[in-house]
Regions:
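Generic hydrophobic/aromatic pocket-lining and core-packing "Φ" positions
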Residues: 108, 209, 225-228
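Non-catalytic positions within long, well-ordered alpha-helices that form the structural scaffold/packing
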Residues: 111-115, 213, 232
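Short acidic/polar active-site loop segments enriched in Thr and Asp
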Residues: 117-118, 218, 237
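Zn-dependent metallopeptidase/amidohydrolase metal-coordination segment
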Residues: 222-260
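Active-site/ligand-binding-proximal alpha/beta "capping" segment
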Residues: 176, 181-218, 283-284
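His/Asp/Glu-rich mid-to-C-terminal helical/loop segments that flank catalytic regions of hydrolases
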Residues: 248-288
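Metabolite-binding pocket within alpha/beta catalytic cores that recognizes anionic/polar moieties
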Residues: 2-5, 9-167
Length: 288
């Protein structure tokens, strides 16, 4: 590992762009959330639960990337959950949409400039673990990055974070305990697992899924990993939650479709919302 001195050439302008976006958002509301959520495919309905919501289309936020994926509303919603101020992204952008890794993580860097201290990253994922079934909610314990890219490659901007961020506990153990505790109280059958990130947009082959299982993956998806890297780079604590919307290729023999993702997301909506409502106040206490 090289210990060359960090350089701020990396994103000449990226820090300023993130700061400008954060300033714009702050001008739209008096809310100053310290918790942010990225709501994945079929999971955006949680933001509709926010009290006193202020909705800002991504298109109005300076430099903010635009969602093109089906089912991603493309707006930032600020409001309160049980009195806790939060910001929720209804939809994210992905590498498969043609965005660069830096564009994919730009919203996370905006959150950092807004003063966010914890981010909840949610996604729809394929179940690799044969003990899972469609509709299962899984707290991410760790990840395997096979996306072939990393948003931290290039000269480092020390204003975002250190050159070599540690990923030993990328997914916060305390936050994962909050999820486990909430699951018991709510009588939800929750899991913990390892998420494997790919670029997409095609679904995986059965042979790939078999190999991922031998690597120790429990879940597979096309998002989240870059956001985790950027969040930890910025010192933001991370909770990752996957909704298993389908069993991965080769498990059932059925073809995979995007429609299935949204159908299952709608089916687990109430459990998903109840879980987040139970966890958010505890995260707020932990970062106070």
């Amino acid at each position: 590992m090289s210990a060359r001195k960090s350089s701020s050439r990396k994103s000449a302008g990226e820090f300023e762009r993130a700061s400008a976006a954060a300033k714009f958002i702050h001008k739209q509301t008096k809310l100053r959330p310290r918790i942010a959520l990225v709501l994945g495919s079929g999971l955006g309905a949680f933001a509709d639960e926010f009290a006193g919501a202020k909705k800002i289309p991504y298109a109005k936020i300076p430099h903010f990337p635009q969602s093109t994926a089906i089912g991603h509303a493309g707006q930032l919603v600020l409001g309160k959950v049980d009195g806790v101020e939060v910001a929720g992204m209804q939809g994210r952008v992905h590498l498969y949409e043609g965005y660069t890794p830096q564009q994919v993580v730009f919203p996370v860097r905006v959150f950092a400039r807004m003063g966010v201290k914890a981010v909840i990253l949610t996604n729809a994922a394929g179940g690799v673990n044969l003990n899972y079934s469609a509709g299962a909610l899984v707290a991410i314990r760790d990840h395997i990055n096979l996306q072939g890219v990393n948003p931290l490659i290039g000269p480092n901007d020390d204003r975002f974070g250190v050159r070599f961020p540690d990923m030993t506990q990328a997914y916060d153990p305390e936050f994962r305990k909050f999820v486990a505790d909430a699951g018991k109280r709510l009588k939800q059958n929750l899991h913990e697992g390892v998420y494997l990130g790919l670029s997409g947009p095609n679904y995986e082959t059965p042979a790939e899924i078999h190999s991922f299982r031998t690597l120790g993956a429990d879940l597979v998806g096309m998002s989240t990993v870059p956001e985790v890297l950027a969040a930890r780079h910025a010192g933001i604590r991370v909770l990752g939650i996957s909704c298993v919307t389908n069993m991965a290729a080769g498990v059932t023999g059925n073809a995979l479709t995007a429609e299935e993702v949204f159908e299952v997301g709608a089916r687990v909506k109430n459990d998903f919302i109840a879980l987040l409502k139970a966890v958010i106040p505890r995260i707020a206490e932990a970062i106070a």
